[in-house]
Amino acid sequence: MADKIRPVWVVGGNRIPFQRSDGKYAHASNQDMLTAAVDGLADRFGLEGERIGDFAAGAVLKHSRELNLSREVVLGSKLAAETPAFDVGQACGTGLEAAIVMAGKIAVGQIDSAVAGGSDTTSDAPIAINESLRRILMDANRQKTVQGRLRQLLRVRPGMIAPEIPVNREARTGLSMGEHTAITAVEWEITREAQDELAYNSHVNLAAAYAAGWQDDLISPYLGAETDGNLRADTTIEKLAKLKPVFGDRDTGTMTAANSTPLSDGASAVLLSTEDWARERGLAPRARFVDAEAAAVDYIVKKEGLLMAPAYAVPRLLARNGLTLQDFDFYEIHEAFAAQVLATLKAWEDEAFCKRRLGLDEPLGSIDRAKLNVRGGSLAAAHPFAATGGRIIANLAKLLDEKGSGRGLISICAAGGQGVAAILER
């Protein structure tokens, strides 16, 4: 272990273009996509054959065959097979949490370099069998004779044969993230117009980033895809206003397919290291990984908003680092739903919430919206759950590197009432 905490740097990142579910990546697995993202990272930073200190990644939707996903990715990638690896899981915060864990190991001197990432596919989601059928099959497998197995299998009924397709619902409530957010939108009085404006800006900013070539050193093509499949460069506020609600009340709902992220597929990876490790290899670190915080809310008994945990994580992070909400040059807030972003921002402006829930004397205040997701967000790029963290880290590190100085805030909401936040500096 190091005698003192060492600075940790984001050297850079790579991802494959995110695609809508059942699109170009319909037959690609988590392992396929994450390996492609890691190989792109290896090509960009000359890591082929390099033994990295550690590798951590994860996926929200995993098959049983992917129990050792990260290690299998390493073994199939251009990294040295001697690179150790393990899986991380925190729903939509997985990619960022993987980076936090790796940054911690670098900071205390356990390793000098690491790769963190995430992958998710809703096109190749695991399909389960009926629970009763599963138990019968397990009972049959335990039998010592053919007759015993047949007796167990004769218990199977036609209704047990139908597969169980995974659904995007919280196990404790039976509601989807969208349905939970629709409740939050009503509670915080988030208007349809405000949500559509956020979605519009997300697409405009990402389209401009592609047009300027800004994404070129952050993305590697995969299976014929060179840009994010969800991006609508020609969208307008008028087009968005015509869409019907998909969550909440059919007549008064405000959440549409455009101001909510679609199911999607993709993968990302980021390279973290000490400054010396990077310089020795001729690499220029982009931003320092300063600190991070995770939080959770009780959305079951206390009925808090499912995706409102970042509203708690961020002020704790600010307090520990002696910062205010306004002390940032960039804000990278994950746009699972426009309503969730706007509700979080509104909570930080709300005196009652900040006093009663956060224990503050006054509101955190507002952010400069011109600094929010300036190169596009999840509403435009899409949100392959575990891959979002890597996209955001790489984006923010590049923004800070280009500016030459400054500070950026990351905020990601996650299923299960969780949230993760982090600070990067240059």
Per-segment meaning from a language model:
Residues G89-D120, A128, A185-W214, A269-W277, ...:
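Active-site-proximal alpha-helical scaffold in enzymes
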Residues V297-A380:
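Active-site pocket-lining segment
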Residues A59-A114, R157-M160, R172-S176, D234-P262, ...:
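Conserved catalytic cysteine-centered active-site region
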Residues A26-A114, S119-K144, G213, I219-G229, ...:
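Conserved beta-ketoacyl condensing-enzyme motif
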Residues N14-I16, A26-A36, R44, R157, ...:
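N-terminal extracellular/periplasmic Venus flytrap/periplasmic-binding protein-like
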Residues N30-F45, L69-V73, A98, M177-T184, ...:
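Short, well-ordered amphipathic alpha-helical segments that serve as non-catalytic structural scaffolds
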Residues M1-A28, Q152-V167, A241-Y312, R320-N321, ...:
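Condensing-enzyme catalytic core mediating Claisen C-C bond formation in acyl metabolism
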Residues S113-I183:
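Flexible glycine-/small-residue-enriched beta->alpha junction loops
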